[in-house]
Amino acid sequence: KVIKQKPNSSMLIALKLLKEKKVNAMITCGNTGALILSSTVLIKKISGVKKVILAPKIPNKYGSFILADAGANINLNPLNFINMAELCSIYSSITNGNNNPSVHLLNIGHEESKGTPILVDAYQALSKKHPNFKGNLEPRYLMDKKIDILLCDGFVGNIVLKLTEGLSHYLLNILKEKSENRFIEDIKNLKNIFNYELSTILLGLNGIVFKCHGSSSYKSFTHAINEAEKMYNLRLINRINNFFKGIETK
């Protein structure tokens, strides 16, 4: 429907260019739902990938961690969580150079019996299928614990993303209002650490696609361009394809 209604939109034109391999990557600040649907139809999912996911890098005390899913899918099953862990592990190995990234499941408690039936089943599935699964993680530890990958459904993930974004802006504004001039440089450094203007990759597609916020600044687009170029040069799509081909041939 989106493709038929707006065939000449900049988003669709860019996706078609990516499909035809006339460009190496695509970046947009357009509607997220339209992007996911259109890219899945035009670019297609990598064989073996169950669902395309939004996987932003969230800054914290130890650098950053990958959050997935951050808004692409609300309804997930245990196999989807395993699939997400696999996708994010490949992405983490490329972006952070960590070949054995830890995987946590966002939940209301650390016990394996906590959460909804889907989360309980996802815990069991990840425990059996993913060697680097480290169990549940409560939200209060997101900012001060060393984690590499944090899994949740898209509804919860989008709330986490927007809450941390809003909270960071609020705290920085409070510091600006209350601090004296001599602390201005420290505030600028904090802003660089808690940078929520960064872009988000759409993992699972047969092409490199980045999503920026609708109110993104030039810094966000600059980051997206640099990240897209990096992922292309490091052959992210080939590496994901090769991983899932290996699974299918076993």
Residue ranges and their predicted role:
Residues L15-I36, K114, L119-D121, A125, ...:
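Glycine-rich phosphate-binding loop
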